């Protein structure tokens, strides 16, 4: 039964992938000639995300109201599926690691939907913030994952604060989203994309699941006007932690060291 389920879902995913490539190629010349607006194309991308989740047998339940609006959107980060889940609910541009651009097919589609690619360790913060602000000025939502990497979901990792400058400089709202992959007990044993796992290995496990339900919790936007980025990042993290009803854990060693460095600088 598991083999049959995987095969059927893989076939459906392949069909949706080919459909995505066809749509992107057909719309490319129309977008260049401005016969199709970027907002319309982003709405199509959101529709495609929903089709892909359906092909994989994944259901999304939303708590709160997700209102498409220009701003910096943030979320906890557990899996590569996070992008499909959030993208299925609203047109949004993502900030993603540069490795995604090299993924077959997925990298092409991500580039077509205006993904901002971040190369780790390349000191690109200023360029990334500028690219995010350009999209904000054009009226788009831009989402990044402040944890900087995926985690198992036991707790929300420390947020990196630098990209919050994109919102602070333009007084753009911060829209907090919280993701939970339902399983009893938590966290989900299969979904987290961690421990140097390959994408194919993780996908293979996800496709074998009889059913996967994801809860996406939307919280009211936070004001970035006049905020200090580190304090804003900590406030955002706390909102997401409370939404997921996670305990405030003892700080992981890396965070303890970061706190000590901050005290020494002070």
What does each of the following model-derived ranges do?
Residues 1-61, 108-112, 209:
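A transmembrane-helix-recognition feature enriched in membrane-embedded lipid enzymes
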Residues 97, 118, 145, 177-179:
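Generic beta-sheet signal
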Residues 78-136, 140:
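Membrane-embedded segments
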Residues 7, 12, 45-98, 110:
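Conserved H-X4-D acyltransferase segment
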Residues 117-120, 219-225, 237-242:
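Polar-ligand-bearing catalytic/cofactor-coordination segments
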Residues 135-164:
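Catalytic-site beta-strand/loop segments enriched in glycine and acidic/polar residues
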Residues 70-72, 139-145, 173:
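Residue-level preference for the first positions of well-ordered beta-strands
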Residues 105-108, 154-235, 249-263:
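A cross-family acyltransferase "interaction/gating" segment
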């Amino acid at each position: 039964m598991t083999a049959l389920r995987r095969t059927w879902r893989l076939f459906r995913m392949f069909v949706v992938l080919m459909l995505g490539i066809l749509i992107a190629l057909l719309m490319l010349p129309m977008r260049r000639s401005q016969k199709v607006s970027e907002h319309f194309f982003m709405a199509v991308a959101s529709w495609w995300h929903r089709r892909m989740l359906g092909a994989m047998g994944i259901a999304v339940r939303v708590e709160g109201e997700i209102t498409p609006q220009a701003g910096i959107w943030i979320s906890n980060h557990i899996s590569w599926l996070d992008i499909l889940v959030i993208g299925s609910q609203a047109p949004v541009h993502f900030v993603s690691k540069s490795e995604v651009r090299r993924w077959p097919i997925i990298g092409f589609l991500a580039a077509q939907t205006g993904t901002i690619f971040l190369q780790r360790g390349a000191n690109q913060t200023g360029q990334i913030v500028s690219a995010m602000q350009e999209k904000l000025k054009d009226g788009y939502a831009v989402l990044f994952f402040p944890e900087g990497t995926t985690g198992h979901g036991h707790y929300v990792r420390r947020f990196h604060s630098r990209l919050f400058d994109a919102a602070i400089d333009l007084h753009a709202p911060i829209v907090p989203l919280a993701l939970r992959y339902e399983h009893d007990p938590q966290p989900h044993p299969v979904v987290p994309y961690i421990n140097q796992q390959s994408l194919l290995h993780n996908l293979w496990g996800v496709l074998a699941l009889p059913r996967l339900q994801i809860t996406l919790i939307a919280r009211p936007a936070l004001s970035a006007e006049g905020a200090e980025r580190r304090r804003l990042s900590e406030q955002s993290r706390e909102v997401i932690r409370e939404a997921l009803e996670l305990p405030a854990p003892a700080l992981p060693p890396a965070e303890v060291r970061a706190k000590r460095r901050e005290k020494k600088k002070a």
